[in-house]
């Protein structure tokens, strides 16, 4: 029995050491970023930086997986400033990726990101949206919510606790907010496929459209990614008043890749290109029309909505 235990622990240690092979992890990560990051020159710069640090033994001091992952993330971000880049060591996350099961998100409580849907006094619709879930998953919640809200005389979209999600939910919601003509919302460039994709509203998705209803979007410095796209789209189309704080500044969508073992990197493979500005909000965020602390944004929006409706 004693020999068995010694052998068991030896094998376990061997597997653990193999999973934490720094050379393998760095070389694989460098290759992933070089071949996939949306800007090739920055992908190469990240590759060169971490390979150089590996060769000069600068990663030798990291003896835990989580600390090593954090160091790699810091190094990659030092080149790009891209907050969509994330390096983690997480067994459950890695297994979900292998199984194409990305785990619980805003849908796990059955609300699919639609945290609160209500009509405020004065017939002002209010949506506290915590995530832009894929419409294919969330339609049974999203459609009744928007069908209810579009009956209001003004709308408030609260994105202060929204970290992003899917462009097709942006398209779905936006389709209620314009007229019968399709509106170009956004374009994405995807480096790995070297292709462009466009997002347009589709009036047929909405039970009713109200192109003139006053819209207010609430933001915070937590508002990120797809939540920023929704905000940026409506701002530049002059379709909404943005109230709150400058957003987080993430305009490079992508997805996770297994590096080795349970090490995972989120790789920004694309970039948003707004059809009006010809650029995006990466690194700068979306600047609100009316700057107030996030906690005061709802109060300000209600005030403005009442003034607008009482004209």
Can you name each region flagged by the protein language model?
Residues 1-20:
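Bacterial Sec-dependent N-terminal signal peptides
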């Amino acid at each position: 029995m004693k020999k068995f235990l010694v052998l068991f622990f030896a094998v376990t240690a061997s597997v653990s050491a193999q999973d934490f092979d720094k050379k393998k992890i760095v070389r694989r990560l460098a290759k992933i970023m070089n071949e996939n990051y949306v800007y090739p020159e920055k992908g190469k710069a990240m590759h060169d930086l971490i390979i150089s640090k590996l060769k000069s033994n600068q990663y030798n001091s990291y003896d835990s997986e989580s600390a090593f992952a954090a160091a790699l993330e810091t190094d990659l971000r030092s080149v790009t400033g891209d907050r969509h880049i994330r390096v983690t060591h997480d067994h459950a996350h890695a297994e979900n990726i292998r199984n194409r099961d990305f785990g619980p998100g805003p849908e796990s409580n059955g609300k699919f990101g639609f945290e609160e849907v209500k009509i405020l006094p004065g017939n002002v619709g209010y949506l506290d949206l915590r995530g832009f879930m894929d419409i294919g998953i969330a339609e049974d919640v999203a459609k009744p919510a928007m069908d209810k809200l579009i009956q209001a005389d003004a709308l408030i979209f609260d994105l202060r606790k929204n970290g992003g999600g899917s462009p097709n939910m942006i398209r779905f919601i936006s389709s209620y907010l314009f007229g019968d003509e399709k509106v170009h919302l956004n374009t994405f460039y995807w480096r790995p496929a070297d292709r462009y994709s466009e997002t347009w509203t589709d009036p047929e998705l909405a039970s009713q459209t109200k192109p003139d209803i006053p819209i207010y979007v609430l933001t915070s410095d937590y508002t990120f990614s797809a939540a920023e796209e929704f905000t940026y789209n409506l701002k530049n189309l002059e379709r909404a008043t943005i109230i709150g704080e400058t957003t987080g500044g993430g305009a490079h969508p992508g997805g996770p890749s297994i590096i080795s073992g349970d090490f995972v990197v989120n790789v920004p493979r694309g970039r948003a290109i707004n059809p009006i500005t010809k650029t995006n909000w990466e690194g700068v965020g979306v600047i609100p029309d009316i700057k107030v602390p996030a906690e005061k944004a709802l109060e300000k929006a209600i005030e403005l909505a009442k003034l607008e409706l009482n004209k």
